Amino acid sequence: MLENDIKKVLYSEEDIILKTKELGAKLTADYAGKNPLLVGVLKGSVPFMAELLKHIDTHVEIDFMVVSSYHGGTTSSGEVKILKDVDTNIEGRDVIFIEDIIDTGRTLKYLRDMFKYRQANSVKVATLFDKPEGRLVDIDADYVCYDIPNEFIVGFGLDYAENYRNLPYVGVLKEEIYSK
């Protein structure tokens, strides 16, 4: 049923798992013995973070934030709202934000600046997808699985109006679905 709304599949579940394994190995090497705090940005990061955790072979702690800049549409509102903050004291910690996608960059820039102000030792960003064409602020991810074209994608945590997150792959949503 859901697949009928997909114009084309960009990345299969197998593709995503392979890239996530590679990223897990990189984070293992970069953070061995450091016990970083991985902060998942909800809701979209859940499938990616769950898969990534399986492939990190060093001690890590996890926490979550709910941050919004979309409010249900297909374009960012420009206003970043923190709906749920982390429970962990991040002072002196190495923090890695786990994101499903970086588009405008506003959310991650806001979070990175906020955590630096809170005196995190380091603040890095790991994302499943980076959409550089959508960038409106100067921020780059430190770890990127895929650079993607400026298309509206869904699946593996990415949504349109809270739907399609449960697709095991990532595909381009048909325009007639989101232009209604």
UniProtKB/Swiss-Prot annotation:
Its cofactor is Mg(2+). InterPro entries: HGPRT, Hxn_phspho_trans, PRibTrfase_dom, PRTase-like. It catalyses: IMP + diphosphate = hypoxanthine + 5-phospho-alpha-D-ribose 1-diphosphate; GMP + diphosphate = guanine + 5-phospho-alpha-D-ribose 1-diphosphate. The active site is at residue 103. GO terms for molecular function: guanine phosphoribosyltransferase activity; hypoxanthine phosphoribosyltransferase activity; magnesium ion binding; nucleotide binding. It is found in: Cytoplasm. GO terms for cellular component: cytosol. Mg(2+) binds at residues 99-100. Gene3D superfamilies: 3.40.50.2020. It is an enzyme of class 2 (transferase). One of its GO terms (biological process) is purine ribonucleoside salvage. Keywords: Cytoplasm, Glycosyltransferase, Magnesium, Metal-binding, Nucleotide-binding, Purine salvage, Transferase. It comes from the Bacteria. Diphosphate binds at residues 43-44, 165. Pfam families: Pribosyltran. Pathway: Purine metabolism; IMP biosynthesis via salvage pathway; IMP from hypoxanthine: step 1/1; Purine metabolism; GMP biosynthesis via salvage pathway; GMP from guanine: step 1/1. GMP binds at residues 131, 152-153, 159. Purine salvage pathway enzyme that catalyzes the transfer of the ribosyl-5-phosphate group from 5-phospho-alpha-D-ribose 1-diphosphate (PRPP) to the N9 position of the 6-oxopurines hypoxanthine and guanine to form the corresponding ribonucleotides IMP (inosine 5'-monophosphate) and GMP (guanosine 5'-monophosphate), with the release of PPi. Belongs to the purine/pyrimidine phosphoribosyltransferase family. This is Hypoxanthine-guanine phosphoribosyltransferase. It comes from Streptococcus agalactiae serotype V (strain ATCC BAA-611 / 2603 V/R).
